[in-house]
């Protein structure tokens, strides 16, 4: 069985043909689809997709590093509350650092957001779904203090070298 460890098929771009795309994935041998969240607005569509395909689609909770404003902390608080009250989440994601775009949120703020979400991974013993673009060293430096307590994770996007990987 194959598992698609990272798909955003719940976004509106797939509203017209989501059922066909998901059916093709399952017919091609995907046994499960893991759904990392993007922002506050994508939580409900992500959970709806999990309800439509129970036992095949599994949600994660996280705030993508390019998807927040100058004050992401109310959103983070609401997401943490969802993690506390609902055991259906299988990971914390999509989280990370993305310094590629000039209009990306401030680097220090991205690091604070990543630290907060990494604390969730430790608290709930859930793996991270990590996004890293043009921020390899900073990402490793941010995650290393948590490494002994983290249950693991997947680098969905990582453009660094083997020497830049954590651990």
Region roles according to the model:
Residues 1-167:
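Mid-domain alpha/beta scaffold segments of enzyme catalytic cores
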């Amino acid at each position: 069985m194959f598992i698609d460890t990272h798909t955003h098929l719940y976004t509106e771009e797939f509203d017209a043909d989501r059922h066909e795309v998901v059916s093709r994935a399952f017919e091609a041998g995907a046994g499960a689809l893991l759904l990392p969240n993007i922002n506050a607005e994508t939580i409900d569509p992500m959970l709806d997709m999990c309800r439509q395909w129970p036992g095949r689609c599994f949600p994660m909770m996280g705030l993508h590093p390019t998807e927040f404003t100058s004050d992401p902390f109310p959103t983070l608080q609401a997401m943490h509350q969802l993690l506390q009250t609902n055991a259906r989440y299988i990971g914390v994601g999509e989280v990370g650092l993305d310094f590629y775009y000039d209009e990306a949120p401030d680097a220090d703020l991205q690091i604070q957001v990543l630290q907060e979400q990494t604390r969730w991974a430790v608290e709930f013993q859930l793996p991270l779904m990590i996004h890293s673009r043009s921020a390899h060293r900073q990402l490793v430096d941010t995650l290393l203090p948590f490494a002994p307590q983290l249950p693991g994770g997947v680098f969905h996007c990582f453009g660094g070298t083997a020497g830049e990987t954590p651990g």
